[in-house]
């Protein structure tokens, strides 16, 4: 906010329901704020409009777009949420399949993606004064849902102190553009505020499926997510490092049991932030209650992939539980804050599940807890042993088995490894493309 020269008005910017910033002012003596409408934008250069249509396999589809002009300046639409991708600084937004932007005449570079199922397309377009059109045609490298696999982001936050105040409907295009079939935004605390409790009963029709879950936070014991119930666990937070409920003394096992009694799933989120959690200097990175809860069978799911943790270190810990014969299903969540400007894309880490029958929330949760799943931050993996898929049991006394692995990746990967009892028993480097078959 800024005062005017005379000191009788305060000027500030605020985002509206169309996720567009507005210039406003309010008297220092109070009263209703005024919106100052911008009648003309002076671009200091001639401009043109560009209508962008997007297809995937010949059908109109939502996509993620990043556009820059000849000077490298981002080109964005006049409304809707705009993000800056936190790792590479790429400014992006989502299109439902058609969008219009305005830009200085000259060349613009358009980068379009559709989740992990299609390689990115980069296209240069010349903009002239007046109206211009372009159609982007992306092709799938793998049609996951056609083979019964569905992608989910089980941990992210709709609103978390950012510039916009989003409604659930505002991210349906985002989910579709990223190829996410089911999303679980988690209600969570922000300090001593408990956000979005009213959204726990939210229902939407059609695809993608959007349901709300809960993040339960004990900083001391470790953070949990609960998905699959519309009831909230209380308290949301407790223990050391909190200015509320700081002296509350309870175990993480309580919310884990609460979820199980409600027919829901719960487990630890962003558990390990280091590459090797078993070194003496890094073992404190493992949440304090996770090992005990895991050994005692309290943990239903473990978030293997998350933006803020190390997938290799988390997977190493997960292998230790599996080696003890403890069935613990893998999950994943991006943990992005959707109303932030600087944030990663929703679904940047995700879990694919192959439910039995059509995709519903219940069939998804059943498939997830049965281990009919794989976690990914890019490559998609279809693995079978003696004809059995992930989540099934191979009953054999033979020391050798037949296996197949099909990989479908929008980006190159370094190598493929197969583990038995936490040890690498087969490995090969990637070559000759991103989508390969092994046996």
List where the protein language model places each region:
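Catalytic cores of extracellular degradative/oxidative enzymes
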Residues: 149-330, 334, 339-341
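Structural motif
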Residues: 18-25
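Short coil/turn segments that connect the beta-strands within blades of beta-propeller domains
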Residues: 6-8
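Short loop/turn segments that connect beta-strands within beta-propeller blades
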Residues: 27-31
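Residue position within the beta-strands of beta-propeller blades
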Residues: 10-13
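Beta-strand-rich domain onsets/edges
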Residues: 34-49, 55-58
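C-terminal functional module detector
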Residues: 55-75, 79-98, 107, 112-139, ...
């Amino acid at each position: 906010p800024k005062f005017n020269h005379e000191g009788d008005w305060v000027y500030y910017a605020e985002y509206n329901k169309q996720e567009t910033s507005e210039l406003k002012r309010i008297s220092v003596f109070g009263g209703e704020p005024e919106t100052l409408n911008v009648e003309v934008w002076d671009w200091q250069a001639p401009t043109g409009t560009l209508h962008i249509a997007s297809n995937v396999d010949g059908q109109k589809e939502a996509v993620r777009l990043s556009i820059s002009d000849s000077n490298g300046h981002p080109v964005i639409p006049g409304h809707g949420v705009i993000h800056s991708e936190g790792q590479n600084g790429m400014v992006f937004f989502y299109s439902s399949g058609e969008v219009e932007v305005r830009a200085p005449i000259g060349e613009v570079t358009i980068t379009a993606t559709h989740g992990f199922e299609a390689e990115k397309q980069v296209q240069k377009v010349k903009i002239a004064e007046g109206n211009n059109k372009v159609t982007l045609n992306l092709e799938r490298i793998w049609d996951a849902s056609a083979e019964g696999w569905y992608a989910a982001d089980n941990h992210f936050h709709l609103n978390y102190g950012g510039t916009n105040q989003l409604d659930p409907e505002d991210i349906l295009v985002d989910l579709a553009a990223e190829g996410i079939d089911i999303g679980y935004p988690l209600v969570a605390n922000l300090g001593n505020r408990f956000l979005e409790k009213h959204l726990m009963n939210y229902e939407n029709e059609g695809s993608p499926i959007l349901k709300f879950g809960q993040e339960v936070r004990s900083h001391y014991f470790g953070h949990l997510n609960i998905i699959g119930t519309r009831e909230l666990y209380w308290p949301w937070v407790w223990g050391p490092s909190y200015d509320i409920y700081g002296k509350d003394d309870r175990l993480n096992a309580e919310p884990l049991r609460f979820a199980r009694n409600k027919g829901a799933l719960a487990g630890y989120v962003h558990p390990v932030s280091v590459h090797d959690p078993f070194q003496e200097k890094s073992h404190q990175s493992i949440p304090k209650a996770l090992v005990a809860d895991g050994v005692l069978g309290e943990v239903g799911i473990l978030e293997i992939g998350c933006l803020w943790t190390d997938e290799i270190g988390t997977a190493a810990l997960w292998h230790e539980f599996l080696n003890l014969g403890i069935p613990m299903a893998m999950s994943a969540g991006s943990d992005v804050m959707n109303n932030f400007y600087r944030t990663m894309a929703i679904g940047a880490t995700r879990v694919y599940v192959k439910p039995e029958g059509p995709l519903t929330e219940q069939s998804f949760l059943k498939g997830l807890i049965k281990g009919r799943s794989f976690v990914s931050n890019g490559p998609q993996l279809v693995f079978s042993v003696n004809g059995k898929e992930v989540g099934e049991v191979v009953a054999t006394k033979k020391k050798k088995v037949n296996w197949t692995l099909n990989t479908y990746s929008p980006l190159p990967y370094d190598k493929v490894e197969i583990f038995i009892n936490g040890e690498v028993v087969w490995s090969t480097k990637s070559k000759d493309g991103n989508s390969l078959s092994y046996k």
